[in-house]
Amino acid sequence: MKKYETVIFDLDGTLLYTLEDLTKATNYALRRMNMPERTLDDVRRFVGNGVARLIELAVPEGTAPEVFEQTLAIFREYYDIHCNDNTKAYDGVIDLLRELKADGYALAIVSNKPDSAVKELAEIYFEGIVKVAIGESAG
């Protein structure tokens, strides 16, 4: 008898390599706001606590709240369209998930990435494998 019935995964850096698309979206927003761009390594250090925190760390210190909000909105708009330009599943992940599903586990993704991107990426990479995919949403 299985001890657990459901396995819940994070998305970024766990199932999918998303760093390049996050970096490109960050730099697109920064460029649009005439701010200095960030390196891949910068963005790697900034991710993990949601996109608002990513942009908060990416904008120059002392950025006015309304400018931060505008930068975040630009990021979200760009990333919503470009969240899968360079993203890819880590080697072996899809096979592992299929095996877990075949063993009777319900699989889910919970992420602080925007909900629309989580659902889109889950559908692209894990359709028919992952039962539920939930991301950050307003409210």
What annotation goes with each model-predicted range?
Residues 21, 50, 88, 95, ...:
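Short alpha-helical
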Residues 1-45, 56:
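Active-site neighborhood of HAD-like aspartate-dependent phosphohydrolases
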Residues 56-95, 103:
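Metal-dependent phosphoesterase signature
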Residues 25, 54, 92, 117-120:
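Phosphate- and divalent-cation-binding pockets in alpha/beta enzyme and binding domains
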Residues 104-108:
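Short active-site oxyanion
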Residues 29-30, 50-64, 121:
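Helix-loop "lid/cap" segments that line or gate small-molecule binding pockets
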Residues 85-88, 114-139:
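Substrate-recognition "cap/lid" segment bordering the active-site pocket of phosphatases
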